[in-house]
A protein has these predicted regions:
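Short, charged, surface-exposed hinge/linker loops at domain edges
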Residues: 1-9, 13, 41-75
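Short aromatic-glycine-(Arg/Gly/Cys) micro-motifs in beta-strand/loop hairpins
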Residues: 12-24
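Structural detector for hydrophobic anchor residues on beta-strands
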Residues: 8, 20, 29-31
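Short amphipathic alpha-helical segments
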Residues: 21, 37-40
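A short, exposed loop/beta-hairpin motif centered on an aromatic-Gly-Thr core
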Residues: 27-37
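Flexible, active-site-adjacent loop/turn segments at secondary-structure boundaries
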Residues: 25-28, 57-59
Length: 75
């Protein structure tokens, strides 16, 4: 069976009450973990389960473009 490698983005958000939420925009999946390592491991597992569910041949990655914006905030 042919294998391919894909790259996905992990956006980590530190939660006020503790732990981390992590989002993968290419696959549109969220998960969480107690620390960064745990959150990333959970994302890897969730991504692999998602790919198995849809089937590698049917996998469609959303195109993600990142741009940083600077905003002026008046206090």
């Amino acid at each position: 069976m042919k294998r391919r490698t894909i790259e996905i983005t992990a956006e980590l958000i530190e939660e006020e009450e503790g732990g981390y939420t992590v989002y993968c925009p290419e696959l549109d999946i969220y998960t969480q973990g107690e620390d960064v390592e745990d959150a990333l491991a959970n994302l890897r597992e969730a991504a692999q389960l998602h790919i198995e569910e849809v089937g590698p041949q049917n996998l469609k990655l959303r195109k993600v473009e990142r741009q940083e914006l600077t905003l002026e905030v008046h206090a």
